[in-house]
């Protein structure tokens, strides 16, 4: 009797040893596609003990005993590891490198006759068509998730705009403020935060205007709104002068690793382009015939579409012709701009919302022509007005006037002589008629004539 009790105890111990290990509550881990995922496994002993990692269908992944690591024949063989530095603290994590969506499943850690289940869910967030987009293009953020999951995602742009959705988020008409880090949070029981860097390819300014006096040197600058370590592409500046009927190409160039190589350049006007970034052009002289608008384009290698910047040139000219002082501007200007002429340190003599103003008989001295917008002076030109005087009479004018006077005198004399001659002719005819009448009367009263011509009584 006494000998059977130890045997029953021994049998009970053997049966307990053959039972499966006790399973604790499942831990859920959210991981990012392409990154390292850490699955936790800990023991209360806080010391190094043997442990094993398996899949839910009992395929061995990794095991450690006496610091000796063994790897099973699984799809993770070349992507798994553990933190040896944490084993002595009773922590035996499984590290999965380059995590993939298909790695999402339940993993089992066996340690101290216990089983700890860890459910891994791997998510991916991709930007389409790319993380580098041209200004004005649309951005689509697509969430990849494990089968059977139903996550939601919320993204916040650098400008603070929030968008929410399930699998796909779209943003149209990207601008420079959208360039930067986008923070996207995936909600699937837990939260997983993605940070994705979006670069909007654009010039810092969509449009710029340069105001210059006639004859001054002009600098056009086209700084980029993004940092570029290696930039390759080609560009062109097409110009539409205000006085021209059509636009023409002023310059074309190639950009190779931030070096500028000019291909073709016009000879009129004289242009010079810088060899380094930022892209910039120099026009030797600002002349009225060059005033107008240009379209500067840059096509980047591997990108569909072009970067655009509009550039305008406004030129001011002040002239004095005889007794007229005139100020004019050429180029694209707003109807709100004010053009004024005034003596220095005095009130404006004339001020109009037009492209030309003038003053008749200007006082001698220093005059100023101002182009302003709501009181802000955009362009100023100074001019020293000379005393005005009556224009000298030209010899040709005297000759013409003398000829006209002589012609008038000759014509008057001719008319006078004709009238006088006609008057004398009429007077002679009248005297002749009187003489004839008198002659006839005398003949009729003669006696011998009367006797011959009169009939007897």
UniProtKB/Swiss-Prot annotation:
One of its GO terms (molecular function) is MHC class II protein complex binding. GO terms for cellular component: cell surface; plasma membrane. Disulfide bonds join 41-109, 155-184, 327-369. It is a single-pass type I membrane protein. Keywords: Adaptive immunity, Cell membrane, Disulfide bond, Glycoprotein, Immunity, Immunoglobulin domain, Lipoprotein, Membrane, Palmitate, Phosphoprotein, Repeat, Signal, Transmembrane, Transmembrane helix. InterPro entries: CD4, CD4-extracel, Ig-like_dom, Ig-like_dom_sf, Ig-like_fold, Ig_C2-set, Ig_sub, Ig_V-set. A lipid is attached at residues 418, 421 (S-palmitoyl cysteine). The keyword Cell membrane applies. It is found in: Cell membrane. The keyword Phosphoprotein applies. Glycans are attached at residues 254, 295, 324. Palmitoylation and association with LCK contribute to the enrichment of CD4 in lipid rafts. Residues 418-457 are cytoplasmic. The chain crosses the membrane at residues 396-417. Forms disulfide-linked homodimers at the cell surface. Interacts with LCK. Interacts with PTK2/FAK1. Binds to P4HB/PDI. Interacts with IL16; this interaction induces a CD4-dependent signaling in lymphocytes. Interacts (via Ig-like V-type domain) with MHCII alpha chain (via alpha-2 domain) and beta chain (via beta-2 domain); this interaction increases the affinity of TCR for peptide-MHCII. CD4 oligomerization via Ig-like C2-type 2 and 3 domains appears to be required for stable binding to MHCII and adhesion between T cells and APCs. The Ig-like V-type domain mediates the interaction with MHCII. This is T-cell surface glycoprotein CD4. It comes from Saimiri sciureus (Common squirrel monkey).
């Amino acid at each position: 009797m006494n000998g059977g009790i130890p045997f029953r105890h021994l049998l009970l111990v053997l049966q307990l040893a053959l039972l499966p290990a006790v399973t604790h509550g499942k831990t859920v881990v959210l991981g990012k596609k392409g990154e390292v995922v850490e699955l936790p496994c800990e023991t209360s002993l806080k010391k190094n003990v043997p442990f094993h990692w398996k899949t839910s269908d009992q395929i061995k992944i990794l095991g450690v005993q006496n610091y000796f690591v063994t790897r099973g024949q699984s799809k993770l063989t070349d992507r798994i590891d553990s933190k040896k530095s944490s084993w002595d603290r009773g922590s035996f994590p499984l590290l999965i490198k380059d995590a993939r969506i298909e790695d999402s499943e339940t993993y089992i850690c066996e340690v101290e006759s216990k089983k700890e289940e860890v459910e891994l869910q791997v998510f991916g967030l991709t930007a389409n068509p790319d993380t580098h987009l041209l200004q004005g293009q649309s951005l689509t953020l697509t969430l990849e998730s494990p089968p059977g999951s139903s996550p939601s995602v919320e993204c916040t742009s650098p400008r603070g705009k929030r968008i929410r959705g399930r699998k796909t988020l779209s943003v149209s008409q990207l601008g420079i403020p959208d360039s930067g880090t986008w923070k996207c949070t995936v909600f699937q029981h837990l939260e997983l935060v993605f940070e994705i860097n979006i670069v909007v390819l654009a010039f810092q300014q969509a449009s710029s205007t340069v105001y210059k006096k006639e004859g001054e040197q002009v600098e056009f600058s086209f700084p980029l709104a993004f940092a570029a370590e290696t930039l390759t592409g080609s560009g062109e500046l097409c110009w539409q002068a205000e006085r021209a009927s059509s636009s023409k190409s002023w310059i074309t160039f190639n950009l190779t690793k931030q070096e500028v190589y000019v291909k073709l350049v016009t000879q009129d006007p004289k242009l010079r382009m810088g060899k380094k970034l930022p892209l910039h052009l120099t026009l030797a002289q600002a002349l009225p015939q060059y005033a107008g608008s240009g379209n500067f384009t840059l096509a980047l290698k591997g990108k569909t579409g072009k970067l655009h910047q509009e550039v305008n040139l406004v030129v001011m000219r002040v002239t004095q012709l005889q007794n007229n002082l005139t100020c004019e501007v050429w180029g694209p200007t707003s109807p709100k701009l004010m053009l004024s002429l005034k003596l220095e340190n005095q009130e404006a003599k004339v001020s109009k919302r037009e492209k030309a103003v003038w003053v008749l008989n200007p006082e001698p001295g220093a005059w100023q022509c101002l182009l302003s917008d709501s009181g802000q002076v955009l362009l100023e030109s100074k001019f020293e007005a000379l005393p005005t005087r009556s224009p000298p009479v030209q010899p040709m004018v005297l000759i013409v006037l003398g000829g006209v006077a002589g012609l008038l005198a000759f014509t008057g004399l001719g008319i006078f002589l004709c009238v006088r001659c006609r008057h004398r002719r009429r007077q002679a005819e009248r005297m002749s008629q009187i003489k004839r009448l008198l002659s006839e009367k005398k003949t009729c009263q003669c006696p011998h004539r009367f006797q011959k011509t009169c009939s007897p009584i």
